A protein has these predicted regions:
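Active-site anion-handling motifs in enzyme catalytic cores
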Residues: 1-191
Length: 191
């Protein structure tokens, strides 16, 4: 749905049938290399809101942390566990993931799709940086934030972070996007 970094479109040549993109930065990159017309913005993972609803009154943890897979083995993960933060692996089966997300009040994530899924399900969330290992840096996060009208910010966490630091993080709890616009751009609506 989007470029990972400037100049990284995932395609080197050929014709692309682009119906929607993650955000304006991706569209700009695609327009540099391909003859791509303006299309709607929105990551398809936001459509999870059309398929799943979080079970009500299940939150038993103040915070959940969704680390990017590349951050999964870091010492900061163990530190977060000692602070009572629920560690959530986004790679698990969808139904299990939804139940784990229902068990938290707020989501911290170094994974873009952790933020997107949290937004789709209406969970307050914030981007955290656990390392500099996530490919693409801020690009894909900025692209997404621009597409849903939210401020892009991130908070670095490490193995010395405290609950006080977590309590000071500003969480995003509202985005602007149009599911119908994304759905109407799907190929089956244009055959």
């Amino acid at each position: 749905a989007g470029c990972i970094a400037p100049g990284k479109t995932g395609h080197s040549r050929g014709k692309l049938d682009v119906r929607a993109v993650r955000g304006p930065l991706t569209l700009k990159e695609l327009r540099k290399r391909f003859n791509v017309s303006p299309v709607p913005f929105g990551d398809p993972a936001l459509l999870m809101s059309q398929m799943y609803v979080l079970p009500a009154n299940q939150a038993i943890h103040e915070y959940g942390l969704i680390p990017h897979w590349i951050d999964a083995g870091l010492a900061v993960i163990e530190r977060m566990k000692t602070l009572g933060v629920k560690i959530i692996d986004i790679r698990q089966p969808t139904q299990s993931l939804i139940l784990e997300l229902a068990s938290v009040k707020k989501v911290l994530s170094s994974s873009l799709h952790g933020l997107i899924l949290s937004d789709a399900l209406g969970l307050p969330n914030a981007r955290v940086r656990l390392s500099s290992n996530v490919i693409g840096g801020d690009f894909k996060f900025s692209d997404y934030c621009l597409s849903v009208g939210r401020e892009h910010s991130s908070t670095p966490l490490d193995d010395k972070s405290t609950i006080s630091k977590l309590n000071q993080i500003k969480f995003n709890d509202h985005i602007r996007w149009d599911a119908d616009l994304i759905l109407s751009s799907a190929p089956w609506n244009h055959e």
